[in-house]
C-alpha cells in the first residue's frame, strides 16, 4: 500500500472524563486508502483531519453555531492510527451543541 494506515475509533459519552463517562456512541473512521467507516460523514471528516494534519486540537470550530451555556459535559475520545502513527485523544465539551460545533464534521456523530 502506498498510504500509511489511518483508522480511528471515536466515542462520545456524558461526563467530564473518559475514565468516568460511559460511551453512548462509537463510530469508526478510516481515511486511507479511501474514506470509509460508520462515521456519518467519512469523506468530509477525513478531509478535515487531513487539513489539520491529524491534530484534533487544530480542528476549526464552526463559527456560525450558537450554543446555550448549559453545562452537560460530553467527552469525545479518539483512538487508533493516523498516517501510521498511534493516536489517543480525549476532549471534554460543555455540552452536545458545543461538541458538534467543535469541528465541521469530525465530532458530529
From Swiss-Prot:
It comes from the Bacteria. GO terms for molecular function: serine-type endopeptidase inhibitor activity. Pfam families: SSI. GO terms for cellular component: extracellular region. The record marks 69-70 as: Reactive bond. Disulfide bonds join 31-46, 67-97. Keywords: Disulfide bond, Protease inhibitor, Secreted, Serine protease inhibitor. This is Subtilisin inhibitor-like protein 7.
Amino acid at each position: 500500500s502506498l498510504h500509511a494506515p489511518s483508522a480511528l475509533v471515536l466515542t462520545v459519552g456524558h461526563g467530564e472524563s473518559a475514565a468516568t463517562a460511559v460511551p453512548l456512541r462509537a463510530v469508526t473512521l478510516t481515511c486511507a486508502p479511501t474514506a470509509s467507516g460508520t462515521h456519518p460523514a467519512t469523506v468530509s471528516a477525513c478531509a478535515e483531519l487531513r487539513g489539520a494534519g491529524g491534530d484534533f486540537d487544530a480542528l476549526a470550530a464552526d463559527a456560525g453555531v450558537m450554543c446555550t451555556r448549559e453545562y452537560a459535559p460530553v467527552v469525545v475520545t479518539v483512538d487508533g492510527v493516523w498516517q501510521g502513527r498511534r493516536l489517543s485523544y480525549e476532549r471534554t465539551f460543555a455540552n452536545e451543541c458545543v461538541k458538534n460545533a467543535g469541528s465541521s464534521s469530525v465530532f458530529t456523530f
